[in-house]
Amino acid sequence: MKTITVFKGDGIGPEITDAVISILKAAHAPLTYEIFNVGAAEYERNGALIPNDAFVSFEKTHLLLKSPITTPIGKGFRSLNVTLRNKYNLYANIRPAKSNDAVKTPFPNVDIVTFRENTEDLYVGIETQIDRNTVHATKIITRTASERIIRDAFIYARKKKRHKVTCVHKANILKLSDGLFLSIFKEIAKEFPDIESDDKIVDNVCMQLVMHPENFDIMVTPNLYGDIISDLTSGLIGGLGLLPSMNIGTDYAMFEAVHGSAPDIAGMHIANP
């Protein structure tokens, strides 16, 4: 039996967590669970987003199943997702979007996996208020982080017998930061001659995804673009509720739904787990 850590989260988080655990038990998954209340509600009750016991559990099990957590917009505490990704070096956010015959959409042949770098870019959250009318945000792209996410995308492609990896970037404008990411992509692509590779500017990718999603296989991208385009791919298959998300590091892994905490329907038991 494998023990996993479970975070119940906010809004619909507790009720869908209970439903998922019921499903896993009915399927006789060889798992035991250490369950914790975390998030904004826990912060209001006890002054901590995550109880220390929850950190201890994750550091022991190395495997986390997390439900949605509310993040204040424009104020308040930092995103708990970002905190967990950085604390445990969960550098690869992998989001597969695949058409489901049970859900009718205009796009029946979608099968796209997005590899999103998870620890840097604008999501490092380094913002400086120069004066009341000016704010600077720092975008960080490093060779180390770029190499590992790009190489992981190609290794996955080879292992899963996929055909193409596309680098998504904005190097036409961000010539140094995205330019570095793109140049590293081209270097690593040479190590995988059996896998087709190409690169596309992010705005063009958004247009092409809603016109010809069947032309995409695996996408690898810096943090911000990956967050946006993976949500777009969820729309192609029927919505965020159908898109799983894996946050993978060298030693730890976190699995979660992509959608939010939906406080407006919390407790109504109408959210599909």
Task: Show the residue positions of the predicted features.
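Glycine-rich phosphate/diphosphate-binding loop of Rossmann-like nucleotide-binding domains
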Residues: I4-A26, D131-D203, N215
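Buried hydrophobic positions in well-ordered alpha/beta secondary-structure cores of metabolic enzymes
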Residues: D10-G13, H62, F115, A153, ...
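N-terminal beta-loop-helix "entrance" segment that forms/cooperates
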Residues: P30-D53, L209
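Glycine-rich phosphate/nucleotide-binding loop
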Residues: A40-E42, L209-P273
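Short acidic loop-to-helix transition motifs that present clustered carboxylates
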Residues: A41, K200-M207
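N-terminal glycine-rich phosphate/adenylate-binding segment common to multiple enzyme folds
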Residues: Y43-K139, L224
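Solvent-exposed alpha-helices and their adjacent loops that cap or buttress functional pockets
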Residues: V56-F58, K104-P108, R158-K159, A189-K190, ...
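Short, acidic/small-residue loops that bind anionic groups at enzyme active sites
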Residues: N86-S99, E191-K200, L242-A257, A266
